[in-house]
Amino acid sequence: MRRKEKIKALLWVAGFAGIICLIYFMLQKGEQTFGVAKDTEDQVQVETSDELEKLLWKSIKFGKKKYQYSSDYETYLFLGTDGSGHESANREEYVGNMADFLMLAVINRKEQTYALLQLNRDTMTEIDLIGKDGEGMATANMQLCTAHWYGGTEKESSENTVNAVSKLLGGLTIDGYYTLNMENISRLNHAAGGVTVTIKNDLTSLDPSMKQGETITLTDEQAYRFVRGRMGVEDGENTSRMERQKQYLEAFLAKIKENMQEDPQTALDVYDEMADVSVTNISGGTITDILTEMHTAENRGIFQIEGESRTGKHLDDGLEHAEFYLTEKGIVTTVKMLYNIKE
């Protein structure tokens, strides 16, 4: 009898121990499951936070330092190309023109402000040497204007220039581009109804009527000479021509604003007029919105990044060409002012 009681007691202890082990196992399993759920929840929160940050902020990076700026800013690149290439050819024989004129429009619709950044075409920077197929991994330190040489179509050349400008400015997000051959400035001037400028220096070598101090409404042919003339004009430097291009752009925008007061469709009409000779990924509606915004917004001015002009042989053709060197400090200072970046 006692033997049976001992066996029962042992069985009871074993059963009780089994129940304890089972409860412990279930608790441990619960903690693990809870931990997985908690980890998943944390991961979702991090991903949501990252997505929200992307919506609120854009970023650029210079060296090891990262800067953030508000996503309220929109940035568009406007290009004016020369006639040095062979852009009417098929992909195999295509050679892009060089970019004579590069201007970024920086717009903040929320704050109702805009600013422009004019870039020197001779700025030395990293260029992607893409091939006729639009592909390529090699890069070279060359003038910014040469980015438009590469590619197999005008679209690819424009996109390569966008990439070069973006890299120059720390990976800046560029929301769209508009490219126009400078040969069509006469047509653009005509579409605006003529642009009025005051001649700041003696430009009679371009046109006898372009005397210093004279205020004239440029004819279509005069407009072309005014923005394109370089060799034998003033000091022959691109920086002097940039000043005239800047002056013409300011006067052109003023003319468009004036015309829009009478006809709000002016910007779209000009866009449509130039559609067959331009290359862009910006719609007519967006262009109209941009110019409408600029019509009423505060103009913060036209910025330039200071640098040093030299000559060099980076084009590897045995000849010396103009080269313009920026400093990282100069770039960062200008970009911080443009996008109101505070540390």
Where does each model-flagged region fall?
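Short, low-complexity patches enriched in S/T/P/G
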Residues: 1-9
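Non-catalytic, solvent-exposed segments at the cell envelope interface
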Residues: 9-12, 16, 23-343
